[in-house]
């Protein structure tokens, strides 16, 4: 609505999310169809943990730079309010066997030996399956390898909060942020952050020798 794009056909919409439902297997296409853009606008879904939304921008910019498209939209979409919670592997296998069964007897046989413990759901995590580590833990490894001191990390964090607060105050984001359900700015911003306050925080990832909070 803001940019008058209703019904317009763009070169591409690229979207991504760290945690998404299986029904949103092509999130970019679904976002394009729900946005009011022309349904002829193609969509693609990318995923790279916390760098997903930045990668979608790079993807769109690269296509524009090489002349493949004239315009496009890139972004990310994540929420922990409606994450996909699934059944454990044991119950999933039973349900698949029951779905493939031809007779009532075969369907019932799929649940032979069923235990109520199988109803325990599997909650999604953000740790890599390969390493078992989340982004914060990898950051800890990097800080140790590169000898990045705790006070240097705190200084960067404080400067980040102060710069964002100043940008909001001077109106930098006025024409960049669209209010949604009454929210018009990041709700994790702490303008009163200080080195002294951050120094009191305990490590968030490596509880014994970590420096990241």
Residue ranges: model-predicted function:
Residues 1-2, 31, 95:
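Short catalytic helix/loop segments, enriched in acidic residues and glycine
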Residues 70-141:
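Flexible glycine-/small-residue-enriched beta->alpha junction loops
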Residues 115, 152-213:
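N-terminal extracellular/periplasmic Venus flytrap/periplasmic-binding protein-like
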Residues 48-78, 143-172:
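Active-site-proximal alpha-helical scaffold in enzymes
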Residues 14-72, 114-116, 130-134, 192-213:
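Conserved catalytic cysteine-centered active-site region
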Residues 7-16, 42-47, 72-76, 152-159, ...:
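Beta-strand segments within the central parallel beta-sheet cores of soluble alpha/beta enzyme folds
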Residues 22, 82-85, 165-170:
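Secretory-pathway/luminal and periplasmic proteins that interact with or process carbohydrate-rich
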Residues 1-9, 142, 146-147:
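Phosphate/pyrophosphate-binding loops at sites that engage ATP/ADP/AMP, CoA/4′-phosphopantetheine
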């Amino acid at each position: 609505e803001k940019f008058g794009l209703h019904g317009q056909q763009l070169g591409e919409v690229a979207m991504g999310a760290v945690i998404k439902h299986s029904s949103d297997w092509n999130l970019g296409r679904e976002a394009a169809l729900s946005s009011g853009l022309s349904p002829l606008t193609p969509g693609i879904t990318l995923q790279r943990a916390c760098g997903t939304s930045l990668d979608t921008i790079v993807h769109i910019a690269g296509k524009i730079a090489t002349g493949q498209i004239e315009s496009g939209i890139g972004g990310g979409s994540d929420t922990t309010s409606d994450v996909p919670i699934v059944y454990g592997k044991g119950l999933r296998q039973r349900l698949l066997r029951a779905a493939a069964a031809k007779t009532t007897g075969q369907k019932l046989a799929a649940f032979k030996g069923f235990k109520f413990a199988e109803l325990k759901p599997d909650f999604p995590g953000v740790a890599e399956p390969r390493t078992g580590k989340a982004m914060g833990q990898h950051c800890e490894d990097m800080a140790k390898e590169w000898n990045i001191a705790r006070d240097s990390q705190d200084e960067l964090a404080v400067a980040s909060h102060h710069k964002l607060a100043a940008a909001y105050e001077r109106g930098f984001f006025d024409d960049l942020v669209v209010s949604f359900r009454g929210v018009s700015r990041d709700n994790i911003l702490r303008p009163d952050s200080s080195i002294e306050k951050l120094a009191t925080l305990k490590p968030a990832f490596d509880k014994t020798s970590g420096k990241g909070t």
